[in-house]
Regions:
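Bacterial N-terminal signal peptides
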Residues: 7-17
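Short, compositionally biased P/S/T/A/G/V-rich stretches that sit at domain boundaries
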Residues: 24-47
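A glycine-anchored, Pro-Gly-centered beta-turn/N-cap motif
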Residues: 48, 110-112
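Short amphipathic, basic-aromatic surface patches that mediate peripheral association
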Residues: 55-66
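Short coil-to-beta strand junction motifs in C2/discoidin
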Residues: 66-74, 133
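Short acidic/polar inter-strand loop motif in beta-rich domains
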Residues: 83-85, 121-129
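Short beta-strand elements
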Residues: 130-143
Length: 143
């Protein structure tokens, strides 16, 4: 009997140690979507300097820190896979945050093949339920 109680207590402690619970994810309309307007998949970008134009439908844009229903802001994933969709999105060279509500951004990438993908998140940089992310595209910066 004591062992069962101890296991239950341990399970509760481990569960409450996670940063976000699924029930805490902000809802998003099922028909909402994010997409990359430009560049297009397979685009060749001479010089490596370009604007990324970000699209959103079925939801609204709000800066980080502003909690309004069905809103959030964009994050651009560069040369990386989607992070865990129930945690805060990292902020590093591969996870670019546009917390002011930007819908376009200037990038400069070195020569090579690069992937780009958008991930929409709430005021605390956590993806919604269901999560909104674009198709991953590949661009090429020639030498």
């Amino acid at each position: 009997m004591k062992q069962t109680g101890l296991l239950a207590l341990l399970a509760c402690m481990l569960a409450t140690n996670s940063p976000v619970f699924a029930a805490d994810l902000k809802p998003m309309p099922k028909d909402a979507k994010v997409y990359i307007i430009w560049p297009q998949d397979g685009q060749v970008i001479p010089g490596g300097k370009f604007w990324v134009r970000m699209g959103l439908s079925g939801a609204g844009v709000a800066p980080a820190g502003i909690d309004k229903p069905f809103t959030g802001h964009q994050h651009l994933l560069v040369d990386t896979d989607l992070p865990p969709l129930d945690e805060e999105i990292p902020n590093d060279k591969n996870h670019l945050h546009y917390g002011l509500g930007q819908t376009e951004a200037r990038l400069e990438l070195p020569p090579g093949r690069h992937t780009l993908q958008l991930l929409f998140a709430d005021e605390g940089h956590v993806p919604h339920d269901p999560p909104l992310y674009s198709k991953k595209i590949t661009i090429i910066v020639p030498p």
